[in-house]
């Protein structure tokens, strides 16, 4: 099996980003640009992944974390792409091939890279190229007019006027045979307008050495677009999100507007899922059959089962939602919550770290925290489970078939027994008996001849 090494060039300063954050750490679809490149590289199961870092390098390494499968090589001076790859030479195998990727080209797909790798072997070279209507700024692919074979790559700054008319450009992504790589890199020169060591100069060397050069192209141009400023980053963000939306629509998802939708992780959908505008999905989100997500909702690490509806302006995170539930509008479901089947959570309700059993309803203006709630419970408007004493959290247990009247407070730790009714306006501090009405109110009185205070007119 052919050994594949990967070199990722991530040492650039990114001046045009106008940011103290290294360019490769700017987020796209919820994760740093470099993470996209690393994730794609890992899909290829390479022998080694070598990251060339420079500007802000320690922060880059810290953000990526301790991955024993990554080799980090520092490029102290940014002297060009050829110089950058040369820094990785001690880490690369003597045989096999090396795939060169760029830390600021985040959206190239693994299938595109697999096709490129298939074109290469231990004694040939493969380039990823693309034809652009406006190729300005890119190196041009120079081909033999008779054989159509690649002869060289000429950078924009060094190209002749006739060469600048060529629309086929070099993306920078290439597969190189390791057996030639050291010799080629040693022969690079910086005698050009930029004074840099261009990796692309090895193409002419390969031609002179009789090495066959193959080319491959991506399915979409935006796969090979790099990020140099915030405008390009924004453009790639939308291209990525529309590509994700297209894939979901091909699976049957219905969008109110696929242009107003963001996935910052992974979204898996069942049949007949409907997603309204301005919804954001973060982490791992799974939606079952016939689920409807209304406008302006945020879902983070959520599993929602068949037939459930999330109404507008709701936020759900780290939660499991059962079948045929109703959540919102304006509901907040916080981490550690499980809603069983047919649970209703209404407007301006917050639930945290709680289990709500099937058929229960919390419809209005309530806070339920650290609670184990049984089946068929009805929580009146303005109910608060008082779970925090200033130092520790305590649990509230509400058993099956309980009715809690409006504007009630349950002071945890407490158990409201099966079938209990809590009268409206009560503050409950002790466990309640099963099947009884429990109240805690002062006696209502009316004061005759009482006059409301009035302001002086002085």
Curated annotation (Swiss-Prot):
Cellular component aspect of the GO annotation: cytoplasm; membrane
Using the UniProt annotation, give all residue ranges assigned to the region (Pyrophosphorylase): 1-230
The primary location reported for this protein is: cytoplasm
> So which domain of life are we looking at?
Bacteria
Q: Which residues hold UDP-N-acetyl-alpha-D-glucosamine?
A: 9-12, 23, 75, 80-81, 139, 155, 170, 228, 334, 352, 367, 378
E.C. number: 2.7.7.23, 2.3.1.157
Region described as Linker: spans on this chain: 231-251
Reactions listed under catalytic activity: alpha-D-glucosamine 1-phosphate + acetyl-CoA = N-acetyl-alpha-D-glucosamine 1-phosphate + CoA + H(+); N-acetyl-alpha-D-glucosamine 1-phosphate + UTP + H(+) = UDP-N-acetyl-alpha-D-glucosamine + diphosphate
List the residue ranges of the region (N-acetyltransferase): 252-458
The record ties this protein, via InterPro entries, to:
Bifunctional_GlmU, GlmU-like, GlmU_C_LbH, Hexapep, MobA-like_NTP_Trfase, Nucleotide-diphossugar_trans, Trimer_LpxA-like_sf
Q: How does it assemble?
A: Homotrimer.
Q: What does this protein do?
A: Catalyzes the last two sequential reactions in the de novo biosynthetic pathway for UDP-N-acetylglucosamine (UDP-GlcNAc). The C-terminal domain catalyzes the transfer of acetyl group from acetyl coenzyme A to glucosamine-1-phosphate (GlcN-1-P) to produce N-acetylglucosamine-1-phosphate (GlcNAc-1-P), which is converted into UDP-GlcNAc by the transfer of uridine 5-monophosphate (from uridine 5-triphosphate), a reaction catalyzed by the N-terminal domain.
Q: What is this protein called?
A: Bifunctional protein GlmU
Native organism is Nitrosomonas eutropha (strain DSM 101675 / C91 / Nm57)
């Amino acid at each position: 099996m052919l050994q594949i090494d990967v070199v990722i060039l991530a040492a650039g300063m990114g001046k045009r980003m106008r940011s103290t954050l290294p360019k490769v750490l700017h987020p796209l679809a919820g994760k740093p640009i470099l993470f996209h490149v690393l994730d794609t590289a890992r899909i290829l199961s390479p022998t080694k992944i070598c990251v060339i870092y420079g500007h802000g390098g320690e922060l880059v390494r810290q953000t990526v974390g301790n991955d024993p499968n990554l080799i980090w090589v520092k490029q102290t001076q940014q002297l060009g792409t050829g110089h950058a790859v040369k820094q990785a030479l001690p880490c690369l195998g003597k045989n096999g091939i090396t795939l060169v990727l760029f830390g600021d080209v985040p959206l190239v797909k693994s299938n595109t890279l697999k096709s490129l790798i298939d074109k290469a072997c231990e004694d040939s070279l493969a380039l990823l190229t693309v034809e652009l209507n406006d190729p300005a700024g890119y190196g041009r692919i120079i081909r033999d007019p008779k054989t159509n074979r690649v002869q060289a790559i000429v950078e924009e700054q060094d190209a002749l006027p006739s060469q600048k008319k060529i629309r086929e450009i070099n993306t920078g992504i290439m597969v190189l045979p390791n057996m030639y790589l050291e010799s080629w890199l040693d022969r690079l020169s910086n005698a050009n307008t930029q004074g840099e060591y261009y990796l692309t100069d090895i193409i002419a060397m390969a031609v002179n050495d009789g090495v066959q050069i193959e080319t491959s192209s991506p399915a979409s141009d935006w796969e090979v677009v790099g990020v140099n400023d915030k405008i390009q980053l924004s453009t790639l963000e939308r291209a990525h999100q529309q590509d994700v939306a297209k894939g979901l629509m091909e699976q049957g998802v219905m969008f109110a507007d696929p242009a107003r939708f963001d996935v910052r992780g992974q979204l898996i959908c069942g049949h007949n899922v409907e997603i309204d505008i301005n919804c954001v999905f973060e982490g791992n989100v799974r939606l079952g059959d016939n689920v409807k997500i209304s406008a302006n909702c945020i879902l983070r690490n959520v599993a929602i089962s068949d037939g459930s509806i999330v109404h507008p302006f709701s936020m759900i995170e780290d939660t499991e939602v059962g079948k045929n539930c109703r959540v919102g509008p304006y509901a907040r479901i916080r981490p550690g919550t499980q809603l069983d089947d047919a649970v209703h959570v209404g407007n301006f309700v917050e639930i945290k770290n709680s289990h709500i059993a099937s058929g229960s309803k919390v419809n209005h203006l309530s806070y339920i925290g650290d609670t184990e709630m049984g089946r068929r419970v009805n929580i009146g408007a303005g109910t608060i489970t008082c779970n925090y004493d200033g130092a520790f959290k305590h649990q509230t247990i509400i058993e099956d078939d309980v009715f809690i009247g409006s504007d009630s407070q349950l002071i945890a730790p407490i158990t409201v027994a099966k079938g209990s009714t809590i009268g409206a306006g009560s503050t409950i501090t002790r466990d309640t008996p099963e099947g009884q009405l429990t109240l805690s109110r002062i006696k209502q009185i009316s004061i005759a001849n009482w006059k409301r205070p009035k302001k002086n007119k002085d």
